[in-house]
Amino acid sequence: MKQYNVTGMSCAACSARVEKAVGKVPGVTACSVSLLTNSMGVEGTAEPSAIIAAVEAAGYGASEKGAAQSSPSADEQQLEDHETPRIRRRLIWSVGFLLVLMYFSMGHMMWGWPLPPFYDNNHVAMGLTQLLLTGIIMVINQKFFISGYKALWHRAPNMDTLVALGATAAFGYSTYALFAMTAAQVRGDEAAVMTYMMDFYFESAAMILTLITVGKMLEARSKGKTTDALKSLMSLAPRTASVLRDGREVEVPVEQVQQGDEFAVRPGESIPVDGVVLEGSSAVNESALTGESIPVDKAPGDGVSAATVNQSGYLRCRATRVGQDTTLSQIIRMVSDAAATKAPIAKIADKVSGVFVPAVISIAAVTTAVWLLLGHPVGYALARGISVLVISCPCALGLATPVAIMVGSGLGAKNGILFKTAASLEETGRVQIVALDKTGTITSGQPRVTDILPAEGVTEQELLTNALALEQKSEHPLARAVLDRAAGLTAPEVSDFQALPGNGLTAVLEGKALWGGSAAFTEKRAAVSPDLQAKTEELSRQGKTPLFFGAEDRLLGVIAVADVIKEDSPRAVRELRNMGIRVVMLTGDNQRTAQAIGAQAGVDQVIAGVLPEGKEAAIRRLMQRGKVAMVGDGINDAPALTRADTGIAIGAGADVAIDAADVVLMNSSLLDVPAAIRLSRATLRNIHENLFWAFFYNAIGIPLAAGVFIPLGLTLNPMFGAAAMSLSSFCVVSNALRLNLFKLRDNRHDHKRTNHLNNENKEEQTMEKTLEIKGMMCPHCEATVRTALEAMPQVQAAQVSHESGTAVVTLTAPVEDDVLRRTVEDKGYTVTAIR
């Protein structure tokens, strides 16, 4: 997506006009314009020159965001609030002249304030003074007229058009009344003079412009605050780096750091670019990127990220990613892109905004005509029409969604939760089912020793020492768990080491044969006591892998290894279920291991034995029951992440640019999943509130201004209409800013949405059939049979075991035995019985 800066936009009608104009350019496949950030994202093959020309033809300005603007410091300067100071200056001058105008126009008549003798009974001089003061205020606020009439000329009227028409009508009619009064005074018609003098609306024109400027300033200040999170991220970017050149440290601008450069970071300094530690150790505070306040220990070989703070030790690092490739830059780009895209819910406001201003102009014209036809004076009828023009506010509609999206995505980024698009921020809160990959998501992804069971007469240290001697030459993933557990122990070198695939390990230590492996491998070498056998079977039921170790024909003991679940996983699952979300675990493990992990985590359903392509099929089946979010590590889960309604990559760390995911979680904590859903729901709720206020305001305000409620004694003059218009946008933006107070990790106020999926096992009539199958030899065979059976629409789940040679199928509707038999036998296996 190419990014552009757009100038000259003042309301939702402007952004809709630009979007429509660019959308017609050949080669443009998608266009999204953000009124909040005055930016535009365009996808397609169209040339930038053609896109800029289309924007200019629509009456606005555009420029491509170039490389010079792509550094965080340049982007930060671009986000600086330049608008508020300009509007403040306009407002100060406008208020100054307005006070003088109000003194002349109303002070003398209403409160008897003294006037210079020159104005005594000099009505023409009084009128000319008001005309002059109003003209000055109109010149000060000429932006409304230039923008409004320019948009009208391009047949794309906007909010400025409404203000300009209202102020022009009031000023024009007042000028006519002044000339008519002058003629009456020349004729000596005092009655006509007083009548025309009462038709002066100079103060209304000036007040409209001043009050709209007040609203614009409040809106600009509030809009500036919505980008605070993004600006705070940009401010984290270090400006300089201490690069090692010819053995000396040289301080250079961070933009000059090249990939492969070595740089030094002292305690208390920010790390300038992404890199890898070459020398030194330290604790690094990564809260700026992940939201996690606990420092992370770094040693040689560990990665470090830009904008994180070195707290305790000296580090020498090599730059691996610089400039726009750093983690910080990618996060900033994600937040900016999310703000530049549009949420699906915004389409409602966009459709209304496209016809809103022309409709309001028509209503104002009809209102004026109706009151004239009813016999009211021109001034009265014109006041009603002007009120309609100045109270109508397309800005409130246009800002309702983008301000909430900006605040929500910024708040997420500060807490390590990155939404790639506005649509992902909206859709995440609507999920009904969360599918969790087991390894690295529910579990740590790193096998650890959980139990040590020495045989009778063997000490724990003796068992660990022999296991260490054997495993230190192994490359098996489970060997790392044993080595970590035996850290601090020393073991002699073994000889004649052999790794027997699928069986175990053998070696010779001091003339004795050492061995280690599975239960089947052990049966041929040593006897296992009934007590130890019972304990290992219990460990297997818990999803742990027992490793048997022995010397010669003697069993030394058992070490159990497992990919243990993270401490916060059960709590995260519990929070998801309390939010009314069904939690499903997907894993390639066998059914027994998967069920054990699933029980510890507390999930609603376990789908085991699925390969990456099987996970994608499982997601497709789950999507038939509701909106699904898939949570995985973004590596082998890419097909499932892409298939799901919302793909969530967890524990991304520095690899934030995961293409398959819609949401990226910087931490490895599963608690960020309910936090992301909670934030999405709060943002969506805020958008609904904003849209309700915007529609309600216009639905009530326009009829009130037109005089529909005058029979009930309710009327509205143009000045109050302008004040209401000014406050409407301010209220919408202020409501969005309330999101900054939202505690996205506080589950005390979670609302449990009604979700029949969590009760489906109680409500759904199910039946089970057991298939006896020959030919299954391994977990891969289990996965093949399970995938084939669960692809059937009537099959809710299939539990397959190659050890027992059975498949237990849970059905939601009757299926003929021959159909089940054929489904399995088509995969090359034999069904001997179905019961």
Model-inferred region functions:
Residues 110-124, 153, 172, 411, ...:
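Membrane-embedded alpha-helical bundles of multi-pass transporters
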Residues 89, 308, 429-475, 503-584, ...:
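ATP-driven catalytic headpiece of P-type ATPases
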Residues 181-184, 190-191, 206-267, 298, ...:
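Juxtamembrane coupling segments of multi-pass membrane pumps/enzymes
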Residues 86-240, 351, 718:
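Transmembrane helix-loop-helix hairpins at the membrane interface
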Residues 16, 29, 267, 431, ...:
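Conserved ATP-binding TGD loop and adjacent catalytic N/P-domain core of P-type ATPases
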Residues 26-49, 200, 231-325, 422-467, ...:
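Conserved cytosolic catalytic loops of P-type ATPases
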Residues 1-125, 223, 232, 248-251, ...:
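Flexible metal-binding regulatory segments at protein termini and peripheral loops
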Residues 289, 348, 383, 396-470, ...:
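Conserved catalytic phosphorylation-site environment of P-type ATPases
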